[in-house]
Structure formats: structure tokens, C-alpha cells
């Protein structure tokens, strides 16, 4: 009669599913988190702890989220959750940037331009409604990523209180003396009809005309005398400039040279020209002239204030000196149009050059522009060239492909154009130097971020903060109708307006009658019609949001975290404003991540068809796989994503999930309140496993603390796959399944598994949030009621290391791992040779040197459980048969033979003592002891 001993085994059992089925299961978990107020429970559990504030850089409220958004929000969420686990109070208030041109353009497409089909007030309301819809759409996707935060109370730059606080920030800028009004060239988008911030400019290749232009000399005698070239050479005499923007020629008001450069008077074919000495050869080659003769040389300084005729207008222009003139290209003489270039403007101010003012807001020449009235600037390029040819002042024309500024929204070329604007001065009150000093106080991650933003601050122009738009926070200023000076009560008036905006939003400004606030002064002062640059909106959130939200409790911001493009964007605008208002950087740490690219390193592009959307990833793989990919990728460089890479992340996920499932299945029936074994009473191997977890936890906590999330994933994988999966968990199966259910041998093992599970679930939670929550719900209850969610908990405190007097210390088990690896290698050879089936069918002899023998013999009969074979003999290396192949592990050689004993149907070990007990004729003595006796005793493994 065959007896079924299956019911005498402690087989693993758990309701924790093998398959994650994440795409299907995660939405229900999110619903549970929301219904049970998870975020508020985290806040309550963290109350009173040291704060860590990560301030959310607001994404723009327009369009669906893309993979870059997902990377950004997931990284932030990992930090917030890990800081909570590290013992911090770390609130997360998500935000959105809600004003600005992209929303205006969308709404224009829906309802028309303001003051045409719809009033400006109605238009603003439509913009507000559109932005609200976009926020809700993006919010759903961010929540779906598993990102925890105060989603019911996000900050929006269009919230009335935030709009009011942005105005108050402007007040502080004015109070500290950083604001001025000036006419200055700014980036101007013809399609936007507005100035652009530095961060809104992209550089793309553009084909432009490249022209060499003659400026005929006013007095040839004077120039000949300067060059000591009287009577030398022949033909007309000109200064030669080179430009790729012919349309700026009508605005030319000077020729700039470098005071320290050498300039030659050159016989170029049948004419005489002035060129920088270093560029004579290259210009001659460019214009196709072989006959060149130097007639004289002077320093640039000697040419100052010499006059030349404008190429096609009836006036002369001076030669001026400028340090911006180099010999990197061109002729060494620079066409200077103060309206259309920052260097031109700066040097022009030194010489009181007039501003031409020929180009209007729509990019067309005004009616008084001779030859080109009403023409668009780019339309005028061929017309200018034609005019230059007509008057004989075009030396050479060709096409050139070069990098040219474009509008980031319209992807169209922009121009520099002088307009009356409001600026934050970089030199006023020493703002530039102060900001550079503050940069050095900040921790930049990666550290190259510091040099990058330093260079940008060193070179950036004054910040033009005014815009000529409808949907934006107004510059709530009153200026004198004649002098343009600010009202003497500006700061008080700003606060009065801010209070009204707090109640009714920005429309309160547009509805305001000047007389309400100014009284009689309304006759001489007018409202400024401009709005603030949206970078002022987001750049002021350190004050408008963080300083005013109760959750932040007046604490300083610890971290800003955004893509690397934000060095010139949000990081820059925030730094400028915070330094201007509070004389300090707004952040202590700045972390930047790279952009996402496809498997071939290409940018995401509709035309290539390589766009990976977070929505598709979550529908196919689930949010946790997306989160694992983000965490396992080194974010300091480009972040590569593809279907193949995500599949690899899914494979890693399965290994982690399988480890967790093994732990839970083998904790079946374990009650920590009743069954927990004291560390000193545990089996040696179990103590080592817990100590192993403690080592891993130290490294994981350190990696989280230093934002090295790919290191966290690597350590997590090593722990699950190597230390646990291929060693400890493999070894303990026999003890778990075959010993008595309540024996010390089994409860010791379960105690270790319980400690490990409690630690593992917390390590995972910041990254694999959904899966960690699922594991948490399946863990055995503790003596004090288990918290409802893992996210309110700190890292596990119950792990312990090996004692100082531990005989079988970590070094011991590391040696055992090497031996086991070598035994497995030889067993695999025997399996492949069909000499054995599984390892339990083998009898192993280890020929070991004295060191290894002493090591192995400490385990006695339990060595076979570590090696997972039915029998192990340890002999001296000197007894090794001559024909036995050497091992790959020095000091030990392994011999494997097939066991001739019988297989025990209960434990599957082979034994020559099966049937010794007549009542259980099929069982080995060990199983008999475990079934009807007191149970086998284990000490080591």
C-alpha cells in the first residue's frame, strides 16, 4: 500500500499571485489609496519629524504627458517616498504652470483673438478654463504613475492667491532696486508678436544669405593718411563688413572694430578695402580675388570715429570700438545695428548711437523706411541684396547654413528687436556676482551642473520680464504718462492690487479704474499694459507657493529636480528672483536628469515614429515596470527606453516578485507574536541571512540618501537573485518543507524570512510602489497592529548583524558560497553527461586542503543541506585520485558519483537506510523522525 506523505510536508502557500498583472491590478490599488486618504496618513505619520522639501517644478498645463514628464515625476516620487522611509517629513505639492503663450494660441484657435471675436476678459476666462482641463488630464496620468502627493490641492500659477503672490514678488524686486525700463534688443518672435525669454529660444540650422558689403569712405585722404598710404593703390576705397542678416542693413548706424587688432588697407583687385590683417587672405578667397597687396596697417583704435557712407542711405556712419569684434570670421569690421543685436546695442550706448526703430511688432518695416516700407524682415533680405547690387556696394553674396535662434513654440526664426521693455538688471545692485556666489553654496547633482549654470549666469543679458500678451500675470505698475517713471507709492499700490487679485484673480487688474487707487494722480499716471514673463511666474514659486503653503511650515527648500534644460530655465529664473528678493539661492540641492532617447540613442520624434508614451507602457507593462526602468537607469546622462529595454525591466521585476512570493508562501502559518525565535537561538545560516539583509539595507539606505537609484536596484537585484535566490532560499527549502511545522529548525527559518520580508518591502516601496503595497497586505500581522500602508513606515529596524563571537561569520559563509558554486559546476557537468539527474541523486566527495577541510567539517552532517546533495564526504586533498580533474577553486577538488541508495519519496534525498522503521517502510530515518518523532535537530543549516 502506497502512503501519501504530502500532508506531512509544510508546502508553501500564499494568496499573493505569481503574476503581477500590473496593468489590470494597479488602478484598483490607486482607488484604494485615494479612498483611504493615503497621502494624508503619510502626512500624519510624519508630523514633527525633520523636514525635507522637494519643490515641484511646474509642468506646462498643455497637452498629454510624455515620457520625460513620467521620468521627472517618478524620480521626485522615489525621493519623497525614500525620504519618508529615512525618517523625514517630506510633503509633495504638485504644481502646474498655467499662463503664457501656448495656452493663448490654443484658445485663439478655439474662440479667436482677444478683442476681435471675444473680449480680453472673456478670453482670459477661456484660457483659465482650458488650463484647468489640461491640469485635470495630466493629473490623472501622473496619479496613474503611482506618484503620491496632495493631488486635491495642487498649486497652479493661475490660483488667485498664487497670482497675488507673484505680484508681491515683483514688489520685492522693485524694492531691492533690480527693475528698470529700457529700450533694448530682445529675442522677438514674429509669430508670437512678443519678446521671448532666453529659455524659450532654441538654435536650429538655417540657410541665410551671406553678404560682403562696401561702406564707401567719406574722406579717402583722411584714411590714406591714417594708413600712411598716400599715393598707394588705386580705385574706390571702402570698409568691408560681412553679415548673414541683410534685412538689418537699413538699421545700420556704425561700423565696429577692435581697438587692439591690426587692420590693413588692401588693394583687392581694382579697389581698395579695409580688412582685419588676419582675415585678408580668407576674405580675398571668399570674394574670388587673387591679386592682393597690403598698402598700409594701423591698429583699430586709429580708425575710431572715421566716417563712411551708409551703403544705400544718404548719411554717414562712424567707426566705433568694441571688444566683441574678433577675427573668428567675417572681415574684422562689424556691421552695427543697435536695434537688432545686444553687442551692437551695448557699444552703441557708449557712442550715443541713435536707435533706428524701423521694425514694428509684426516684423514689418514701418512706413517711413525708405525702399522697404511694409515688407517683412525676411522678405526684405533679397530686396536689400538687390538694392546693394543696384548701388554698387555688394562685394559678394552666397548662401550659408548656420545655427540660428528659433522660437521654441513655433519652430520659426526669430529676430533681435529693440523695444521698450522692463528688465531685471544683472549688474544693478550686483545681482550677477551675488548669484554666482550663491551657486557655490548649492549641491549640484551631477556636479557638472554647477559649471553649466555658472557659465550661463556669467554670460546672460539683463532679464526682460515684460511681455505683450493677454493671458498672464499683469505687471501691476503705474507709470507717469510723460516721464515713464514709476509712481512714488508703487510698493503700496502693488500690495493693494495683490489683495484684489487674491480675491478675484488677475482680471481684477484689468477691471481696475486707475482713479480707485490713484485719485487725482490718475490724470498723470497710466497702467502698464504688459504681462510678466511666465518664467517669472514659475521662478517665483519659492515665495509665491512654498513660503505661503502651511504644509511647508516656512522651511527652506531642499531640492529642485528637473531635466537638464532647466539650468537656463526654471533653475535660472528661480535663482535670479530669489537672489534679487531674498539675497540667497532658493534651493540647497539641484538634481538634473537627462532626456529620454530610443534604443538607438535618437530623440523621440513623430517623424521617426519612435515615441514611447507612458500611457502605452502602463497599459502594456504596468506602472511599476515604468518606475523600475526609471530607477534602474543612470539619470545623469541620456535615458534610453525601448520595448526591449522595458522587457528587460519586466524580467528584473519578475525576479524580485518571485523572491517576495517565496518569502510570503513560506511564512504561511507563521505568527510573529507566537513563533518568533530570538536571534541567539536561531540556526547559524538564518542569522547570517538576516545579517546579509542588514548589510544590504545599509547600502540601499545610503544609495537612496545620495539619489543613486540605479544602485538601489542593482543591490536589490543582487540580494534577491544572488544572496537569497541562488543560495539561502535554495538551501532552506528542505528545512522549510520537511521539518516539523513548529520545530525550531523551521521557525528559525521563518523568523529570518519574516525579518527579510519586512525589510525588503520597505526597500522596494519608493520604486515598486504598487507591488510593495500588495506585499504589505500579505505580510503576517505583528504584535502591534500593522500600519495600513507601507508608505507611512520608516526602513525596518528589526534586522540584526552577526555577533562578534559568531563562529560561522560572514567570511565563513562567503567561503561556503564559493565551495557550493564549484560543487554546482561539477554537478552540472555530471547532469549534462547524463550521469545523474538532480543534485540529490549525487554523492559528493570533497578533497580539500587543511583550511577548507576545517571549514567544511564544522557543518558536520549538515554540509549536505548546504550543497543540496544526499551525501557529502570531506577528505584530504592528498587523497585525491590521480585521474580526477582539478577544480576551478584552488584548494579543493570535487568528485561526483551517482547514489546507489534509494530515494525517499517525502524528502527526495537518497538514503541506504530507507525502511529501517517498519511502520514507514518507504521513509528515510530523518523523515520518520520528522513525521512521528520529536523532529530532527539542526544547528547550522
UniProtKB/Swiss-Prot annotation:
Enzyme type, top EC level: ligase
Subcellular location: Cytoplasm
UniProt keyword list: Aminoacyl-tRNA synthetase, ATP-binding, Cytoplasm, Ligase, Metal-binding, Nucleotide-binding, Protein biosynthesis, Zinc
Record: residues binding ATP: 606
Superkingdom, natural source: Bacteria
Cofactor(s) for this UniProt protein: Zn(2+)
Binding-site residues for Zn(2+), renumbered to this chain: 904, 907, 924, 927
Sequence positions that bind L-isoleucyl-5'-AMP: 562
One GO term of the biological process aspect: isoleucyl-tRNA aminoacylation
Motif ('HIGH' region): 59-69
GO CC, one annotated term: cytosol
Family that this chain belongs to: Belongs to the class-I aminoacyl-tRNA synthetase family. IleS type 1 subfamily.
HAMAP family hit by this protein: Ile_tRNA_synth_type1
Role according to the record: Catalyzes the attachment of isoleucine to tRNA(Ile). As IleRS can inadvertently accommodate and process structurally similar amino acids such as valine, to avoid such errors it has two additional distinct tRNA(Ile)-dependent editing activities. One activity is designated as 'pretransfer' editing and involves the hydrolysis of activated Val-AMP. The other activity is designated 'posttransfer' editing and involves deacylation of mischarged Val-tRNA(Ile).
Free-text note on domains in this protein's UniProt record: IleRS has two distinct active sites: one for aminoacylation and one for editing. The misactivated valine is translocated from the active site to the editing site, which sterically excludes the correctly activated isoleucine. The single editing site contains two valyl binding pockets, one specific for each substrate (Val-AMP or Val-tRNA(Ile)).
Quaternary structure (record): Monomer.
Identification of the protein by name: Isoleucine--tRNA ligase
Organism: Haemophilus influenzae (strain PittEE)
Organism lineage: Bacteria, Pseudomonadati, Pseudomonadota, Gammaproteobacteria, Pasteurellales
